[in-house]
């Protein structure tokens, strides 16, 4: 799956013609403001806005340097990284989601493992990088905090003829472990499929200890081309033991030479068309006999296969395959399971976590299996404990959350209705509907409780993906619903309850039989052309924004006026131009003007400089793209659908976003806006380069006095960095900053200005 850029803290500087510039600042509720209480089945969720879990990988690392091993989760759906701090005692499972550490990690790619390669007790980071393996050293200290340093962009191995990268297809997860017990980390990966009817495991032996006496990752050789003397059959979910063909027929001997053709096969490994779609492998002594076994998952297979070592660690030969592992409840997902080891309950024993490794093709709700190790330090015994580990503390409605704020029961409190792609079913389809969280708090302190995961039984209708908007579509005074869908159609639900009564929504089929805008329609309602009739403005795939002109107030009827509202071409702004757009036209403050705000599933949020009544208006100004290249893992990685409403009666609208993983996040409006910002000359400070790596310059007017300068990150945390002023140029030395998005606040002659930059 392509890397999706993440949703981070939103800092929008919105410039509008005829207005002073507004600084709009939205923050997660976990920062500087008490968290919103979310209740499910009588239990308050610990991490409601963590964003959901779909196809995740799990690693153990002391994130906050308190001596306890925490959990790092990397989800391939949305390239989302999450950190969970271990706050449990001995024999206790208790983890706390903490967004402060998410953006301390580098860009991961498709897979991630954390192992201590240099023996300093700190887990280092190995991850996918262009079909190879990148390594980041954990250089965290009490003064630095959590910090990683790139050691090598692609780990190499040497032969007598070549030195090349160890190729790992992005869909695979290799095993990085001390295979032979010599004190450094080796690498096991599935090999090139062209040489056998299946795939052997190749062992890349780490010779750093042998050559230097110190553990490292400097010297790898290909030690065995058929480690374990077995292959995984390409034609089915089968492990073939004691395979007699090449290269296993060589007696599992050491091989450090490659022919040119074999070398080329290695280079092309990541793009092979004749190999299966992906494999995962985990090396561990699962039987307690001192020999390394291997647990294998495969794309297209629902179970994991434990191959047991009947020889020794140097000359491993697998002589038995267990297909129902673990025995207490065998790992079984629709496809492509992966497994990870770590001590979850603080008893000193490694536990087992299993999760699907492919997005959009497997379970997305009960999909994180935790097996606690009830054995001992020598002989592990994994017992099933939980099917929703960590996910049970989050809002998670399967996949593709599309939230809306609405007062469904007309009690004056704003509730949350969430449409979604839905829950994955065993036949490969999705059960799509509406999930309702009712506000049981007060007007100033919202508190939400799950009422149903299938509001009004709408999943039985068969609509694939609900993306709802609520408004009075027939001018009878009550609130109706129109929903978009994955097929690009729109569906009408009439509210027959009457004004001021709890909703009674009834599906009216074939209302919009000729209204199809493509795929993944996501509407909002607004009288855009100011003719007194509500229109629909809908995002869809490829970032298109459609204007559907309303024809009548008495009954919902719309005509597609343009599929490119304002000639906006968001595809040119994104790395992956197939994403979907979502639109909200709302006030951000009680006395505010209406704002045209839009986002996409990648997590970017934009605003137009103005609302135009002419849908064919061209050359509109799209202000302040929030570039989150660095913030792939910050916050909820949302933007799948957005909505805004003042849920705490403070005169400011809060922002809710859905995530591809079925989660949501709510952001409080921290703006003291509209805030007038004095502008210099042409309404901007001249600053450059942006993005930047080590130096950032800001030009100020000649002969002006610089009173103060502060640099903060998106959390509002001040960063002490050196700067100098020569003539009218401020020079900021930013090399010490971690990659990210920063704001510079400047005071010149008692006037306040701001600038922003992205540290690469």
PLM feature spans:
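Short amphipathic alpha-helical "recognition" segments used for binding
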Residues: 6-7, 442, 658, 760
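Bacterial Sec-dependent N-terminal signal peptides
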Residues: 1-26, 675-677, 690, 741, ...
């Amino acid at each position: 799956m392509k890397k999706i850029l993440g949703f981070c803290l939103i800092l929008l500087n919105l410039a509008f013609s005829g207005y002073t510039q507004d600084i709009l600042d939205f923050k997660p509720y976990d920062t500087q403001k008490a968290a919103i209480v979310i209740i499910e089945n009588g239990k308050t969720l610990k991490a409601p806005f963590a964003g959901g879990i779909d196809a995740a990988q799990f690693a153990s690392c002391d994130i906050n340097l308190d001596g306890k091993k925490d959990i790092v989760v990397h989800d391939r759906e949305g390239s989302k990284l999450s950190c969970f701090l271990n706050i449990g005692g001995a024999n206790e499972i208790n983890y706390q989601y903490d967004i402060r550490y998410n953006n301390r990690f580098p860009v991961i790619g498709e897979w991630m493992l954390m192992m201590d390669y240099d023996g300093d007790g700190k887990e280092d980071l190995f991850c996918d990088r262009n079909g190879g393996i990148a390594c980041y050293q954990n250089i965290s200290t009490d003064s630095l905090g959590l910090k990683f340093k790139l050691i090598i962009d692609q780990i190499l191995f040497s032969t007598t003829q070549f030195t090349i990268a160890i190729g790992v297809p992005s869909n695979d997860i290799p095993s990085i472990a001390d295979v032979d017990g010599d004190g450094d980390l080796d690498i096991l990966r599935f090999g090139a499929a062209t040489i056998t009817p299946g795939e052997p495991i190749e062992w890349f032996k780490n010779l750093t200890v042998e050559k230097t006496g110190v553990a490292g990752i400097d010297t790898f050789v290909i030690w065995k081309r058929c480690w374990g003397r077995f292959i995984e059959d390409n034609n089915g979910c089968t492990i073939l033991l004691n395979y007699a063909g090449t290269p296993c027929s060589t007696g599992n001997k050491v091989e450090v030479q490659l022919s040119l053709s074999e070398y080329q096969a290695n280079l092309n490994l990541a793009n092979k068309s004749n190999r299966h779609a992906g494999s995962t492998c985990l090396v561990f002594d699962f039987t307690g006999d001192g020999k390394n076994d291997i647990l294998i998952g495969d794309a297209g297979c629902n179970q994991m296969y434990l191959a047991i070592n009947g020889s020794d660690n140097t000359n491993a030969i697998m002589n038995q395959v267990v297909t129902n592992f673990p025995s207490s409840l065998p790992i079984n997902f629709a496809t492509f399971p992966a497994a990870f080891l770590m001590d979850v309950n603080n008893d000193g024993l490694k536990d087992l976590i299993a999760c699907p490794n492919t997005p959009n093709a497997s379970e997305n709700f009960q999909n994180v299996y935790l097996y606690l190790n009830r054995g001992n330090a020598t002989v592990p015994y994994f017992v099933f404990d939980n099917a929703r580990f960590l996910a049970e503390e989050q809002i998670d409605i399967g996949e593709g959350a599309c939230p809306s704020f609405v007062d469904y029961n007309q009690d004056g409190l704003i509730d949350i209705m969430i449409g979604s792609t839905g829950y994955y079913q065993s036949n490969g389809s999705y059960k799509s509907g509406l999930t309702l969280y009712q506000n049981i708090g007060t007007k100033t302190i919202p508190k939400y409780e799950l009422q149903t995961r299938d509001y009004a039984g709408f999943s039985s209708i068969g609509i694939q993906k609900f993306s709802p908007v609520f408004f009075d579509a027939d001018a009878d005074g009550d609130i109706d619903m129109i929903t978009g869908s994955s097929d690009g159609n729109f569906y009408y639900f009439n509210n027959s309850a009457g004004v001021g009564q709890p909703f009674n929504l009834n599906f009216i089929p074939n209302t919009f039989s000729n209204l199809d805008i493509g795929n993944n329609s996501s509407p909002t309602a607004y009288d855009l052309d100011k003719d007194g009739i509500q229109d629909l403005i809908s995002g869809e795939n490829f970032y298109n924004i459609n204007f559907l002109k309303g024809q009548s107030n008495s009954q919902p009827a719309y005509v597609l006026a343009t599929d490119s509202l304002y000639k906006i071409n968001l595809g040119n702004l994104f790395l992956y131009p197939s994403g979907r757009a979502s639109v909200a036209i709302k006030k951000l403050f009680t006395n505010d003007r209406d704002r045209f705000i839009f986002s996409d599933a990648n997590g970017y949020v934009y605003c137009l400089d103005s609302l135009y009544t002419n849908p064919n208006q061209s050359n509109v100004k799209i202000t302040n793209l929030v570039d989150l290249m660095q913030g792939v893992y910050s916050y909820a990685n949302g933007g799948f659908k957005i909505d805004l409403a003042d849920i705490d009666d403070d005169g400011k609208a809060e922002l809710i976003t859905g995530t591809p993983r079925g989660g949501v996040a709510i952001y409080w409006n921290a703006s003291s806006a509209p805030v007038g910002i004095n502008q210099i000359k042409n309404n901007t400070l001249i600053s450059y380069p942006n993005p930047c790596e080590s130096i950032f310059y800001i030009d100020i007017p000649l002969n002006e006095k610089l009173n103060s300068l502060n640099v903060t990150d998106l959390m509002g945390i001040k960063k002490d960095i050196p700067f100098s002023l020569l003539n009218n140029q401020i020079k900021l030395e930013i090399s010490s900053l971690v990659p990210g998005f920063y704001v510079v606040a400047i005071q010149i002659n008692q006037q306040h200005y701001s600038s922003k930059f992205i540290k690469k």
